[in-house]
Regions:
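Extended, charged alpha-beta segments that form solvent-exposed binding/catalytic grooves
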Residues: 1-192
């Protein structure tokens, strides 16, 4: 857990504002999700990985288990599914801190800032193109040049595995590392 001093805080806040304005220009609406929620709501339909990265505490009023969010995407999905009740595409964006029980890699923060844009209710190729374009503009605005694009479609992953012609053990190790988003481990498996 680290402090962000004035000069760096100013840069981060300027970038956050710029990116939220960018997302708004594409029609995305800002949502702010709770930092802490009851576990049954926070982790519904989520992966074991998210459960492992979620800090858990006992609510002193109700005695129920609560969690401090480790990801905002599931909360945004819940807002779309249960709160907005809209027809057609729904575009939501967010920017806030999350908290992880352990860092996701070497030299990474346990309290990272997450910013994102989510498009719900539309599954055409236009949706994919829109999100890749937004991602590209986001990376360019952040002056990030060394880019690795991670596409979360298992069909793409399986096709790449076939092309790579890896043995079964390596495929299994790679799949586990990808699911856990352990980027250092992915590099290690691919370079072995």
């Amino acid at each position: 857990v680290e402090e962000i001093l004035p000069a760096e805080a100013y840069k981060l806040e300027s970038l956050r504002r710029h990116l939220l304005d960018l997302y708004e220009s594409w029609g995305y609406q800002l949502v702010i999700t709770p930092l802490i929620e009851y576990l049954d709501s926070l982790l519904v339909g989520s992966s074991t990985d998210l459960d492992l990265h979620t800090f858990k505490i006992t609510d002193q009023l109700s005695g129920r288990m609560m969690g401090i969010r480790a990801d905002i995407t599931p909360q945004a999905a819940r807002i779309d599914a249960h709160c907005l009740n809209r027809e057609g595409p729904v575009r939501l964006c967010y920017a806030d801190n999350v908290l992880h029980t352990r860092p996701r890699g070497i030299m990474t923060s346990r309290v990272p800032i997450r910013i994102g844009a989510e498009l719900y209710g539309y599954s055409g190729v236009e949706c994919d193109i829109e999100l890749v374009c937004i991602m590209h503009e986001t990376l360019r605005a952040a002056e990030i040049n060394d880019v690795h694009i991670v596409l979360g479609h298992v069909g793409i992953f399986r096709t790449l595995l076939l092309e790579a012609n890896l043995d079964e053990g390596t495929e299994r190790s790679l799949f586990e590392a990808v699911q856990r988003k352990e980027y250092d481990r992915i590099d290690e498996v691919l370079n072995s």
